[in-house]
Structure formats: C-alpha cells, structure tokens
Amino acid sequence: MSINAFGIDLGTSNIKIFHKNEDAILVEKNMIAIENKKNVFAYGDSAFEMYEKAPANINISYPLSNGVIADIKNMETLIKYFIGGLTKGGVKGADYYVAVPTDITEVEKRAFYDLIKDANVKAKKIMFVEKAIADGLGMDIDVKKLSRQQYIGYFKIWFIVLGIV
C-alpha cells in the first residue's frame, strides 16, 4: 500500500515540495503575480521572470517574509496550484509534513497549519518538522545518532544531537 504524503519546505525564496506517491520533487520560486488585484496571472518561476518587468496593473510578491507567512491568501493559492501540478488525477487524502523554522512562535506555527488546512488539498494529517531536522534528513544524515557534527546553513548554524536541534 502506497502512502500519499507530501513534504513541504516553504522558504522565503523557494518552495520545495516532495510527493512520496509520485516520487516527484518540485522546486519553484515562492512568488505570485496578481493582475488587477484579483486575478492570478503567474505562479512560481513564471512570476519570478516577470519581477520588476511587469506592467503597473500586475503586482508580483513573495507571500512569505523572513520565513513566516505574510500573505495567507496568496500562499494558499500557490500551495493549491503546486500540489495540484504534482498529483496525477487530483489530490486525494494525504499526510503533509511541513518544515518550519525553529525560532517561530506558536501563532506563526498555527498559520502554517491553517495554510495547509484551508488550501483545499485534502489533508488527513498535518505535521511539523523543524527545518534543521528536515535539512539534515535531506542531506542523508542520521539525525538520531549521537555525533559531534555541526551544519552551517545559509544564515544559521545548528547542532543536531539525538534528533534535537
């Protein structure tokens, strides 16, 4: 029996989504272009190509700012669009594993939960994974193993010991 699950890393610049069922990975710019303040004109990389070149009636924005959700409506639109593009035959009930920054508040964490719940992507379960742990797993590091290693990210340095950041 295959598990319908998605791993989502909502970065300020890029969205990364892994679909376990399809063994597919999507990496797109976390941008959206809105025409006349109501119609979606472009998503992801297409919106990025228009950045600073679009006419005045098209607003291009990043729905995330400093790792937290700044525009929930546009972020929901992006999630729905990208997950719909990864699934063949539509989204069925799925588990969602969302990478969240270690240093966010419970209110900010709740915004990530509400984002997935309200995006109409048929979430059965929504679970959070600290970004440092998700990054370690992505680098094929045994995060539960006791070791003396440090990992230097783009802006942060973290130590993972026995699965704790």
Which sequence ranges carry the predicted segments?
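Nucleotide/phosphate-binding catalytic cleft detector across ATP-hydrolyzing
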Residues: M1-T12, K16-E28, A33-F41, D45-I152, ...
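Conserved phosphate-interacting/catalytic interface
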Residues: W158
